[in-house]
Each structure stands twice: as C-alpha cells, then as structure tokens.
Amino acid sequence: MNKKGKVLFIIHDVYQEDNEFPLGIAYLAAVLKKQGVEVKICCQEVFHWSNKEMAELFLKNDEYDLIGVGFLAARFKKTIVDLCETINKYKKDAWLVLGGQGASPIADYVLKTAKADVAIIGEGEETIVDLLNCKISDKDLSKVKGIAYREDEKVFFNERRKPIMNLDSIPFPEWSLFPMERYSSCIYSFGSDKKAKRIGMLSSRGCINRCNFCYRMEHGIRLRSVDNIIEEIKTLKRDYGITYFTMYDELFCFPKKRTIDFCKAVIKNNLNIEFDCNARVDVFDRETAVYLKEAGCKFLNFGFESSDQKVLDLMKKNTTVQENIEAAKIANEVG
C-alpha cells in the first residue's frame, strides 16, 4: 500500500440516469492526490453496480486506509445503511468515513445506525488530510478537528474546524478520476445546444443571508477570484469539451462587482460558453442582468419561495414580494 495512504470514495447509487457530478468528492480527491495519496473512485451511481458487484470490484481484493461515502439525509435509510453494511463486511482495517449534508447535522445518529467509524462535519478538504495522517500514523482521533467518531459504541465530537477562507488555495476538482464523458452528457442543459457537454462548478461557498430553512452550518459567503474561476472554465473546456456550466453556488450573483467582472472576463477571453446560476432578488438589477446575458447566462434561479410577505418574513428571507416581481420582470425583459 502507498506509504502516503490509500483512499476509496464510493459515489452511491441514486437509481437515476441524470447524475450530477460529485463535486465534493472530487475536491477531496484533488487535495489527497496533491499530497501523494493513492485515490480510487467507485462511481456506483453511474454504472449502477449492486453492492455485491461493488464489493467484488473494489473491496474484496484491495485494502484502503479510508473508505469515504457522502450523502444527503433523504438517502440514508434507503441506500446508505445497506451500502455501509457491505463496506463493513469487506473493509478490513480501513476506517469507514461518512460526510456531506446528510452526515454533518446528525453525526451521532448516522454513525451509530450505519456503524461507521468517522463522520466529517462541515467542509472536508483539510479534515480528510488530517484524518488520513492520523490513520497511517496511528495517532489519537480526538486530536482531529471537524469530526465525530465512534468508539466502543459511543460517539465523540471533536472541536469544529474553521471554514477555508481562501478558496483559491483549494486545487481544482480531480476530474481525471471520474468518467467525465458520462457525467458531462447525462444532464439536460438550458443552453442553445441541448446536447452540449455540461458540468457543475462552484465559484463561492455560503450566502449573505440566513433563511431559517437552510441546511448550511457556516455563516457568511466566501468567494473565489475571477481569475481562478476563469482558469477552471478554460481547463474544463480544453480537456473535456465542456461548454455549458451550472454554477452550484447558493448565491452566484454577489457581490455585483464580482459578477460583472466575471462576465467581462468571459467575454474578453472569448470563452463562448453558456451557464446558469442562482441569484437573490434584493441584490439583482438590470445592469447585472445585461452583463449576465452577454456572457452567456441562459437561466437564472431566484429563491422566490412565496408570494405572501408574511411567509417570507417567517422564513427570514429578508426580501419582499415586490422585489420578487421586479427581479422576474427584469430577467424576462433582458431575456
């Protein structure tokens, strides 16, 4: 086994064909690869291997230090518990690590129910490196920030890890480990070419608001630089033929200056791409809409949530019904 460690990530099956690229796992893989770690990816959701087939292909005849599974809470009982049962049967000396939006808020429950070893709470790029070093060096798990872990049927919570402030310091996702042809061609785009290769990316993390229904654990918004975003787009277009991008940001169109600077950079570099993104009605105006359209934006998603002001106030949206109407009007008029 690689002295710097060996990690397997399993992208569990969601029993559908239009699978979104697993961006979170791809970031973790990139960080580990940069450290010289051997990383393998099992894309169960793309190839629809049964748990038994997955075990034959990835677990029975191989050994790992960590086996990671990310998930949404809605998939836990239906999919993850059975998957973890299979992993535990064949994992040998590996630690079974859970992460994602499903694991972070209810780590105690998921660790006990799935009989996993560790749950990463919050962002995982720094935590996964520390966790692997802890495993291969046989160090104390209680010293690893940003995790909960199970020991003797008890769950222990360590100190929370602070979010990564400089997003440009995170390497681009490790696309080379994934079946990019499948991921880039299975999702319908809103672009002029419905068969254009499409992929998702993140230009920021977080949001300026704190709606009371939001799953986010951190406060505020952190931004990548425009140059860094443009370089990723160029790389994806050059290496994988991607021409349509879905911006996964909770709030892409903020601040206004960065949004316009991004649009200007797309135009200046003659990228000839199309994209869709999310916006808030209270920080959206006609000038922004014009630049977005010129840069290739084909679809804007506003979180209107309700046409009743009382409901918006209860949600703590900090927006008004009139702002919803005005934003929709501007977007339609600009086209």
Where are the regions that the model predicts?
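A structural signal for short coil/turn segments at secondary-structure junctions
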Residues: N2, G36, N61-D62, K91, ...
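Glycine-rich beta-alpha loop elements in corrinoid/cobalamin-binding modules
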Residues: K6, L28-N166
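A short, glycine/small-residue-rich beta-strand->loop->alpha-helix junction that serves as a flexible
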Residues: V14-L23, L72-K77, K197
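Conserved beta-strand positions
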Residues: F9, V69, L98, I121, ...
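A short, flexible N-terminal coil/short beta segment enriched in small residues
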Residues: N2-L23, V31, Q35
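N-terminal [4Fe-4S]-dependent radical SAM core
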Residues: N2-K3, L8, V14, V144, ...
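Residues at alpha-helix caps and immediate loop-helix transition turns in enzyme cores, especially N-
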Residues: E20-G24, N51-M54, T79-L83, S225, ...
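Radical SAM [4Fe-4S] cluster-binding motif and immediate context
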Residues: P173-V334
